[in-house]
């Protein structure tokens, strides 16, 4: 079972562990002269609400998986999450060759293929 402590309207910026590793590898091989004085980049990702994520879960794993979500609001967690950025425009990173998933469905596909316990042989 999984506890959902926030409303389904909460939006996050997401990328897979696969993309995070690709970001590091690409950054390590990047010609840094192209960065100029601004050395920070916002990495690509997917802006998605919790509702978007639940809908993608339903498409990938069915209603049975969604039924395992226990909605229990937690005001402390809601307060923390409320201060997080909701979306980014990672144009600079994209122009430099960084890339990530483009949908929540793709994020779930990557998880099932690489990170789910069944993918690990557990």
Q: Where are the language model's segments positioned?
A:
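Amphipathic terminal alpha-helices
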Residues: 71-73, 83-95, 102-122
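Short, flexible active-site loop motifs that bind/organize anionic cofactors or intermediates
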Residues: 10, 43, 83, 97
């Amino acid at each position: 079972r999984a506890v959902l402590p926030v409303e389904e309207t909460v939006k996050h910026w997401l990328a897979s562990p696969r993309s995070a590793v690709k970001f590091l590898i690409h950054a390590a091989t990047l010609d840094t002269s192209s960065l100029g004085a601004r050395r920070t980049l916002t990495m690509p990702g997917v802006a998605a609400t919790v509702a978007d994520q639940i809908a993608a879960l339903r498409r990938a794993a069915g209603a049975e998986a969604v039924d395992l979500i226990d909605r229990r609001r937690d005001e402390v967690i809601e307060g923390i999450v409320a201060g997080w950025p909701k979306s980014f425009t990672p144009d600079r990173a994209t122009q430099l060759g960084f890339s990530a998933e483009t949908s929540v469905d793709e994020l779930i596909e990557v998880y099932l293929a690489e990170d789910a316990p069944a993918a690990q042989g557990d």
